[in-house]
């Protein structure tokens, strides 16, 4: 779309750092969530000019491969891979291009920087991500009678690390998870950072950041140019009771964003507190 072209200028393949690499893709927040928050998930992708080819986006692939091609020709693109250049979208697009011409049953191994070329925004048909969460990584070897020892070992390690995660239905890119005895909600917000921080500060002062009960807002982290607020939840909360409070909070945020005004001294202090509790993930 126009926004990502305006943000990133002519050099689609140069290695300048791109703050919001997924801007311009439908469901930018879901891309960020799958890269930073969700352990095991897939979503089908459609490549322009190869609409009949089965392509699946996956959070993680065996041995942290950037991409692989199953024996039946299905391409898997791994999202949680180490960035090589300054533009995550270009890195992923380069891996996808390699996978589309790779032999069935092979994996893509990155070599050096990808160099100039198309980004995901250029390769993919515009369509929202239809995310499927998985309890583990068995989808790697679905239909494979005897996965190799290396892949099997990688699968066992990955399965052991999976954090129980559920996606909320009422708003995009909001994910409940349980880590040991603790539960959290992490919610990737699509709004531009500066006005969003103002709105969050206003809600914080008005006690409007709660989700009811003993849920506690604990801060936010920045990922790929978007803010991800995090709430600490009492054990046993689960995802379902969060649906209504999260939709109510989204409405309060929308109201605050729609009526910007200078912050009061108290709100400015609250905004500084929000910033001091930020952590940036790339």
Feature locations, PLM:
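A short, cysteine/histidine-rich metal-binding "knuckle" motif
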Residues: 1-13
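A short acidic-to-branched-hydrophobic micro-motif
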Residues: 179-198
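Secondary-structure transition/turn motif
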Residues: 78-86, 189-192, 233-235
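Short acidic, Pro/Gly- and aromatic-enriched capping/linker segments at domain boundaries
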Residues: 200-219
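Surface-exposed beta-loop interaction hotspot
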Residues: 105-179
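Long, contiguous binding/interaction regions
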Residues: 37, 163, 279-282
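Alpha-helical oligomerization segments
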Residues: 214-282
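N-terminal membrane-targeting/anchoring modules of bacterial envelope and secretion proteins
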Residues: 11-139
């Amino acid at each position: 779309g126009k926004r990502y072209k305006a943000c990133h200028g002519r050099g689609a393949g140069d290695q300048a750092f791109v703050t919001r690499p997924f801007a311009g893709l439908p469901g930018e927040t879901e891309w960020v969530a799958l890269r930073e928050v969700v352990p095991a998930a897939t979503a089908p992708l459609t490549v322009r000019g190869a609409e009949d080819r089965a392509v699946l986006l996956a959070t993680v692939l065996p041995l942290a491969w950037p991409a692989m091609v199953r024996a039946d020709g299905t391409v898997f693109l791994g999202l949680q891979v180490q960035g090589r250049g300054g533009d995550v979208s270009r890195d992923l697009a380069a891996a996808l291009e390699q996978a589309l011409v790779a032999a069935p049953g092979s994996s893509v191994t990155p070599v050096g920087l990808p160099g100039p070329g198309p980004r995901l925004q250029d390769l993919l048909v515009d369509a929202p991500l239809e995310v499927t969460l998985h309890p583990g990584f068995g989808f790697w070897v679905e239909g494979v009678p005897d996965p190799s020892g290396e892949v099997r070992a990688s699968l066992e390690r990955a399965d052991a690390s999976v954090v129980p995660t559920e996606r909320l239905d009422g708003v995009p890119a909001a994910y409940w998870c349980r880590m040991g005895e603790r539960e959290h909600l992490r919610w990737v917000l699509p709004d531009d950072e500066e006005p969003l921080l103002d709105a969050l500060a206003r809600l914080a002062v008005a006690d409007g950041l709660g989700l009811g009960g003993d849920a506690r807002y604990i801060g936010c982290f920045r990922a790929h140019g978007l803010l991800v607020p995090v709430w600490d939840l009492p054990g046993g909360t689960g995802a379902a009771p969060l649906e209504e409070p999260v939709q109510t909070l989204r409405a309060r945020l929308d109201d605050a964003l729609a009526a910007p005004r200078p912050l009061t001294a108290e709100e400015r202090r609250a905004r500084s507190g929000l910033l001091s509790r930020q952590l940036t993930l790339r």
